[in-house]
Amino acid sequence: MKQGIITKTCAVAAALAMGVSLAACGGGSSADSDKGHVYFMNNKSEVVDQYKQLAEMYTEKTGVQVDVQTGASGTYDATMSSELAKSNAPTMFNISGFDQFAKYQKYCEPLQDTEAYKLLTDDGKAYSYTIDGDSFTLPYAAEWYGIIYNKKIINDYASKDYAVIKSADDIKDYKTLKAVAESINEHKDDLGVDGAFATPGLDASDTYRFSAHMGRIPLYYEYKDMNTTFSKTIKGTYLDNYKDLFDLELETSPTDPSLVSSKTYDDVTSEFALGQVAFYPNGVWAYTQIKGNEVADDDLGMLPYYMGIKGEEESGPAGVYDASWAVNKNASDKDKQATLDFIKWMVTDDEAKKILSQDMGFSVPFTTFDGDEFQPDNPLTKIARSYAADGKIEVRSFTVPDQQWQDDVAAALIEYAQGTGDWSKVKSAYVDGWATEWNNNEESLGSVPQAQKFDQQG
């Protein structure tokens, strides 16, 4: 993590004492205290330099002081709690996940009537944490996940006499995906690959792909059936479909199922990046590890998570909007307005928009980011976004309980893959664990997500 330039010695000392890094201090003679003050508590250390640049640009342009403080890895919550208790508390801060929202909800200003909120896309509004009609957060980074594939391998396969498709465009459902994967695996020596799917790695570094991501696909369709966006209890209606895809990955990957728990995120990403497999379920963020290896940008594609669920053919990849901005309701009216003006500037000024989208790499869910020049230079992001342009419905990533639920699902999957446990343990971890962890969260956090009608999202 790169440290920003600090202009005040006392600020450095305070930062070191708290284990955080100050990314930027607006100030100097250009700042005008009569115009209010913006103090942003950031939790993304990888973009600290870009936030520093935005802060300096805005202060120079408006005379409003913008301070940015960045919590070091693992210390954000502790630093937030300390800073929010002070008289000069942050005027805006990051929220990542429902657990953080529940913890800091009492500090959050309702934003649904602000200009910035009104500039959110419909998907952005749907992911804003909302209670009783009040929307408290502004999602600022959209990402997508699905089944990434290598077009070169698929096209090579499609040219063979034994191919079951004419081109990658024929893969529009799970039945076809399964037939292609099994056929590629059968003819892998002729195709020069090690398998069809990348190893479903169940090392701790890789389990999120199967709990937090793939696990949300059956949840989406179950919630759709229930016409709700949240329930403390679920049935696992589509877990058999999840099992079908997981089994397909196990059966057509380069790794013996008994060994998948030893495969790390880096291991399985390398399988795809080096052109050893055709399919790799993951998100757009994987591009940073894929690029510069054996798979050209033009050879990257992305399918939705096909599992054989009725209606999935009309859906695109799943979207996730975990990173949001919130405004401190306890700030002075002057500072709140200065903060809202700063946020609006970030999402409307062309130079600021390029920093957010291209330099930070965010696909920002505001209507002002409608051109390619305001999207990240990431072919997977462009592909994922193209599904919506073609009329496909984005699968929404509904909130899962906590890390414990994810860990328990992963542990059951490991036993299943190794043959030491059966599928009923996975279902129990998914279904029974869901109720257990939401009850625990309600007791510890004091709230759970507020349910809305599924067909009235956004």
Model-predicted regions and their roles:
Residues 4, 11-14, 19-100, 116-119, ...:
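Conserved N-terminal structural module of periplasmic/extracytoplasmic solute-binding proteins
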Residues 70-79, 172-176, 259-274:
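Short helix-initiation/N-cap motifs at beta->coil->alpha
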Residues 96-155, 209, 301-305, 375-376:
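Hinge/lid segment of periplasmic solute-binding proteins
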Residues 112-123, 127, 166-170, 201-204, ...:
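Short, solvent-exposed loop/beta-turn-alpha elements that line the ligand-binding surface or hinge
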Residues 132-140, 145, 175-231, 277:
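Extracytoplasmic/periplasmic solute-binding protein
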Residues 133, 293-361:
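Extracytoplasmic/periplasmic substrate-recognition and gating elements
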Residues 181-182, 227-262:
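Glycine-centered hinge/linker elements that transmit conformational signals in sensory
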Residues 303-305, 357-415, 443-458:
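Long, aromatic- and glycine/proline-rich binding clefts that accommodate carbohydrate-like moieties
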